[in-house]
Amino acid sequence: MREFEADGRSIQAEPGETILEALRREGIHVPTLCHMEGLPPTGACRLCVVEVEGVPGLVPACSYPAAEGMKVRTRTPRVLQARRTIVELLLSSHPDDCLYCARSGRCDLQKLATDLGIRQRPYRGVQPRQELDVSSPSIIRDPSKCILCGRCVRMCEEIQGVSAIDFIGRGSRTYVGAAFGSGLNLSSCVNCGQCLLVCPTGALSEHSSLDAVVAALGDPTKTVVVQHAPAVSVSLAEEAGLKPGTDVDGQMVAALRRLGFNYVFDTSFTADLTIMEEGSELVERVTKGGVLPMLTSCSPGWIKFVEQFYPDFIPNLSTCKSPQQMMGAIIKSFWAERQGLDPARIVSVSIMPCTAKKFECTRPEMAPAHVPDVDYVLTTRELGQMLRMFGVDLAAMEPQAADTPFGERSSAGKIFGASGGVMEAALRSAHFLITGREIEHVRIQALRGFKGIKEFHVEIDGLEVGAAAASGLANARTLLDQVRAGRRDLQFIEIMTCPGGCINGGGQPIGADLKAVRARME
């Protein structure tokens, strides 16, 4: 350990830690805009500058190593003025439409300006008029609000391995965009929305379907049916100001009915169908010489990733639809017939933790006879906004059960939202199908957790099955490249597009730290 002084306090730093890491661990706040936890620092925004005794200039705390005996000052007039000037310069060319911005009240730049007491605009910069990119069904890009922090670029390239966006141009003409100035719909974007989660301003936001859903709820000729994913019930609490990880499943069902939805179904029901189908398919492929390793097919961002970057692995994908699309198909076929309803008059809405689900429901193969199985997808954030719009207090709702017959679920369906959950549930099903016995639960939990790639080998009635679970598409690349190179000990691979799984999806509450995401998993 190395000891140094910060604002008169003694701070212990681990070897290799930066000043910022040591200060944050001790609860000392230093503002940043470009910093991303877990990635090497760039020092681009300079908001984290501090004074170090003996060093003539201000130093970036995010990249300056903590050293024994150094004396650091984080809030001197010189430091505070430097931070104010940086934010004032960022605001000099930033749009003034905060009241109409999707991130109003949750904008890092807005909060910094408030915290630093900036009430006037001392600098006037050029505000270039750049068109909104609304080409993607999942994400809206507003280049005029981009502050070039680089967080979206790093997320897309380093964590997701997609590189759909990058810095374009030089100097004051630099901007972030897709190749050749095209829209996101023509780029390699997989619609995961992870860029949206790390964007500090309103430069990136989801393509909202909220107005369309509200209009449908007000149409007496429509039967509006809603399904909700298991990951939503453990994250919606944050939108209502409750403790992260609080499971509000029953209250959410009651709130959805209060909003006016005619029927409320639990997507965990079709997650159970997915588990049984994938388990059966795995057994058949392993025992009858099918294409291996079998790859899960629940995550739409991952499916687009395979189609674009690894088309040779398309035969390896499970034949299952995602639980969302399974439920949508059942609602507009079996359930509609049972209820005596015209599928064309059913509005099928899903509440998902994922922006890529908005893309998935628009795929032509998900609209037999040109009638989409799922009409609209709302993210967890959009549902939170809808509750506030309608004045529904989630915490005050009495818990209710989802409607039958699609309100029943097993515990296996509930764990779908966490990385490793699909794999664990499918392996348990495969084990039961082969042996007639439940698998030892403690051992299979090796597939859970936040590790990017997890592996597990199990013997099922003399049959050796190697399984791996990866979350984050850069980790998916690693596994697929190993299989391409000749690795043969894996028969089943689960891929979740988002790091940690759906609990950390692109449609989840903004501003959640790792502690909050872990609480959702638990």
What are these regions (language model features)?
Residues 6-7, 139-140, 182, 238-241:
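Short, contiguous strand/loop micro-motifs
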Residues 1-9:
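Eukaryote-biased recognition of intrinsically disordered, low-complexity regulatory segments
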